[in-house]
Amino acid sequence: MVYKFERKDIKVNKYYFTSESVTEGHPDKLCDYIADSILDECLKQDKFSRTAIEVFAYNNTIEVVGQVTSNAQIEIEKIVREKVKEIGYDDEYTGMNYKNCEININITKQSPDIALGVDVGGAGDQGIMFGYACNETDNYMPYAINLAHKLANRLAIVRKEKIIPYIRPDGKTQVTVEYVEGKPKRIETVLISTQHLAEINIEKLREDVKKEVIDAVIDSNM
């Protein structure tokens, strides 16, 4: 009697997941921070304030537009300059300077139709967000986004503490993680982009960012 054995390859459930994080100087984050700060000041003075604020940043210019209905007396231009300065946009090399940036403000009161709708049905135009806790990290965040946030935070630290003195506020980090059977196996890719002085050699930038940012955050075993 002859027995025939056939080998069947076991398929491994493998996939890649990418997450990104931006630094405080990224235009999206800058604009969000300004809008949030205006809202905070309104609510500090009048808890019944209603705001719908949009902020745009480009070419040393900040645009603040939208609708505000509030009894609060706020200085929007002052808030904008304070936040731009706080983030670190303080010279011509960054493309934005709190000292001389142009600030255009076009704020009106909330339209009666929208006000009535809010009175009757509550705030509209809301997004639906979802999330979950997981056991991949100590803070229950997914591994990829946790690393991306840590890299972005480290990028901000080395700028503010002048460990890498020539980088500027705008930056982004991206991490791709390989998962096997639903668990992080290894880091596939780490990408970091950062604003910097024009005269800096790209090789010097890569060397400094790898040493002071990536190596300070990423586990070499991954």
Stretches with model-predicted labels:
Residues 3-52:
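N-terminal, positively charged regions that mediate nucleic acid binding
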Residues 24, 66, 194:
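Short glycine-centered, acidic/aromatic-flanked micro-motifs in structured strand/loop junctions
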Residues 52-70:
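Short, charge-patterned binding micro-sites
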